[in-house]
Design a protein with these regions (language model features):
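ABC transporter nucleotide-binding domain
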Residues: 168-253
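Hydrophobic anchor residue at the start of the ABC signature
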Residues: 139, 143
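Conserved ABC transporter NBD signature motif
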Residues: 57-68, 72-73
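Catalytic Walker B motif of ABC-type/P-loop ATPase nucleotide-binding domains
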Residues: 150-154, 159
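ABC-family P-loop ATPase nucleotide-binding domains
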Residues: 75, 81-138
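Helix-to-loop junction immediately C-terminal to a conserved catalytic motif
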Residues: 49
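Conserved structural motif at the start of ABC-family nucleotide-binding domains
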Residues: 4, 18-20, 74
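The feature captures the beta-strand-to-loop junction immediately N-terminal to the Walker
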Residues: 31-36
Length: 282
């Protein structure tokens, strides 16, 4: 079941453009949104949630345009950004009253349960929280108003490896413990996304390169390092992308062509991204 449909999203700035961005999110899936800095991930997420006005295009959430959602329907969307957009002087525990009056579906028991499990001191002010604690606080908010769609923009920034692992487990449980749920998450730490994501969406310079299941990426692509001499003699039809290395070439190819290459390795999502952005075609 498709919970989110983004169709031909366009947004033009002076030095950047989202160009006909289209993809979909299905129930029961976690989508890794991958691209280099400045590729359009944050702009896309803001466009999905109505935080910026689009030049053209449409976004459907739970079957309705984001511009037609009621206040209660909007609560089905949990959106977190890298920074907390709340007054720094407010204490963590006092924010519960604000959220309770803001969200019809606010569950303070869930909220304080997350704060307790995250070891967040509720007597502290927002400005007194570390970057990692702010990241945890952000996700606690998103998971406490009965959202079924999570849009997470670099939510693991500032978390140490143990906390990131806990965070990944939390997101996996969010999908497993409920029906009709989906997650779109961006992160520059692609190895973390590979632990939990079922699918990947690649974006570069404001354009979607590909949307594909992780299993297909894992099982269909290989990377090879060859000498300059070997590169000159390779059948060009068997190369998807290539890039220069020191006195050699790195190659991305289909696994079905592995018999033609020596010392092949499976290409992961990060490899695929690097080849798509920095690599060249023959």
């Amino acid at each position: 079941m498709r919970l989110v449909e983004v169709t031909e999203m366009n947004k033009t700035y002076e030095k950047f453009k989202l160009d006909n961005v289209s993809f979909h999110l299905e129930s029961g899936h976690i989508y890794g949104f991958i691209g280099a800095n400045g590729s359009g991930k944050s702009t896309t997420m803001k466009g999905m949630t109505g935080l910026i006005n689009l030049d053209s295009g449409s976004v459907l959430m739970n079957g309705k345009s984001i511009y037609e959602l009621s206040s209660v329907e909007k609560e089905k969307i949990g959106f977190t950004m890298d920074e907390i957009c709340l007054p720094d002087n407010l204490k963590v525990n006092s924010l519960n009253k604000i959220f309770k009056s803001t969200f019809d579906n606010w569950d303070e028991n869930v909220f304080f349960g997350f704060l307790n499990s995250f070891n967040i001191d509720t007597s502290k002010k927002i400005k007194e929280l570390s970057k990692g604690m702010k990241a945890k606080f952000n996700i606690a908010i998103s998971l406490s108003h009965n959202a079924n769609i999570l849009i997470l923009d670099e939510p693991m920034n500032g978390l140490d490896p143990v906390a990131r692992d806990e965070f990944c487990e939390l997101l996996s449980n969010f999908i497993l413990d409920g029906e009709d749920r989906t997650i779109l998450i961006s992160s520059h730490i692609i190895s973390d996304l590979e632990k939990i994501c079922t699918d990947f969406i690649f974006i570069n310079e404001g354009k979607i390169i590909i949307q594909e299941k992780k299993s297909i990426l894992d099982n269909n692509f290989i990377k090879i390092n060859v000498s300059e001499e070997e590169f000159e003699n390779i059948d060009r039809h068997k190369i998807i992308r290539y890039k220069r290395a020191i006195n050699s070439y790195d190659i991305l190819a289909l696994k079905e062509n592995s018999e033609y290459f020596a010392n092949c390795e499976n290409a992961n999502a990060e490899d695929f991204l690097v080849f798509m952005i920095r690599g060249k075609t023959i």
